[in-house]
Regions:
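Acidic, divalent-metal-coordinating active-site segment for phosphoryl/phosphodiester hydrolysis
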Residues: 68-75
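Short aromatic/basic micro-patch
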Residues: 55, 70, 85
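Short alpha-helical scaffolding segments that buttress acidic/His motifs in well-ordered protein cores
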Residues: 64-65, 113-116, 132, 152
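Interdomain hinge/lid region at the active-site interface
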Residues: 141-145, 151
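C-terminal long alpha-helix characteristic of the crotonase
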Residues: 28-33, 82-130, 137, 143, ...
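Terminal peptide-recognition signature
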Residues: 4, 21, 76, 113, ...
Length: 163
């Protein structure tokens, strides 16, 4: 996927549900949501959980996969798995507000920022910096790169064109 994705978790996200929420770029959860990687409880493996090492601390990751015990939305927020918590009735509004905040950014810059984050989890620091620079060249040389500072100086919202 080239566009940012947002998971909205209301209820339980166990096993495959966790996998889907983890695969998204951002995650909003209701305050009643629960998360668990339960594979050890049923004799299965969870190789899909490997990218968590780039999302949460190693010992917390280890506890989650070794015990299979659920964690609350609050705990998921504390360890960095969840970006925002909302009341169940406000979950979708909260997720949509986050989406609107992302959409306020220049499209090419948002895409480059997302690509930089993804690349930095796949390579070493020096290579990630080089790749990040390459990812941002298009954004820096775009019409939007001219529009952003101009709109700022004119105290107005930018009119992004995505080019």
């Amino acid at each position: 996927l080239s566009k940012p994705t947002i998971a909205a978790v209301n209820g339980v996200a166990f096993a495959g549900g966790w996998m889907i929420s983890q695969a998204c770029d951002l995650c909003v959860a209701s305050d009643t949501a629960k998360f668990a990687i339960t594979e050890v409880k049923v004799g299965r493996g969870s190789p899909w959980a490997a990218p968590l090492i780039h999302m949460i601390p190693q010992r917390i990751f280890m506890e989650i996969v070794l015990t299979g015990k659920p964690i609350s939305a609050q705990r998921a927020y504390e360890i960095g798995l969840v970006n925002r918590i909302a009341e169940p009735a406000a979950l979708m509004d909260t997720a949509l507000e986050l989406a609107r905040e992302v959409l306020e950014g220049a499209p090419l810059s948002v895409a480059a920022a997302r690509e930089t984050v993804m690349l930095s989890t796949e390579m070493g620091r020096a290579a990630a910096i080089d790749a990040g620079y390459e990812a941002h060249v298009t954004a820096y040389t775009s019409e939007d790169a001219q529009e952003g500072p101009l709109a700022f100086s004119q105290k107005r919202k930018p009119e992004w064109k995505g080019r």
